[in-house]
């Protein structure tokens, strides 16, 4: 009897987990030293975010890791109001000699507001969680998720382009 109950609970727990995290990852080689990749990564962060020091959570040059915690605000207009959803995400930059890795993950909604009212915090997923969990219909949900994914994809692509560009010319200007 215990085994049957355990099996039922085990199977149900897998079905109850609804959030499927958005993940972007790339590992590639570039003709740059670890130090140059690190410097270029810090420069990219400074150019991409308004306050680079406030988003950097971990910065270890020796280990070749820079970890940032970013935020994104997505607006969608429906029911005659502007609904504002705020999301957090983590970007990890790893670097070695002639090699880098970028990883974007831990994307989640931490706030949903419409005026003074709090809306449900929705899962970030490629599948519609239902009206009760999303607080909006399927079409609006996918519009919001696509806008969020496009923003994160743009950051991902910008970094790859930035880090792959050749080493800047001489500093004698």
Residue ranges and their predicted role:
Residues 16-173:
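Ser/Thr-rich, low-complexity intrinsically disordered terminal regions
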């Amino acid at each position: 009897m215990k085994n049957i109950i355990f099996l039922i609970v085990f199977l149900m727990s897998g079905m109850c987990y609804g959030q499927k995290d958005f993940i972007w990852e790339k590992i590639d080689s570039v003709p740059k030293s670890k130090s140059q990749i690190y410097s270029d990564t810090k420069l990219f962060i400074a150019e991409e975010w308004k306050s680079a020091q406030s988003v950097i959570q971990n910065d270890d040059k020796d280990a070749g890791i820079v970890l940032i915690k970013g935020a994104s605000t997505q607006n969608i207009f429906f029911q005659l109001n502007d609904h504002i959803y705020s999301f957090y995400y983590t970007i990890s930059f790893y670097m070695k000699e002639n090699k880098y890795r970028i990883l974007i993950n831990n994307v989640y909604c931490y706030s949903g507001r419409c005026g003074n009212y709090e809306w449900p915090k929705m899962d970030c997923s490629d599948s519609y969680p239902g009206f009760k969990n999303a607080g909006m219909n399927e079409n609006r949900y996918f519009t919001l998720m696509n806008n969020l994914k496009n923003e994160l994809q743009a950051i991902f692509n910008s970094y790859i382009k930035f880090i792959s560009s050749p080493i800047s010319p001489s500093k004698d200007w």
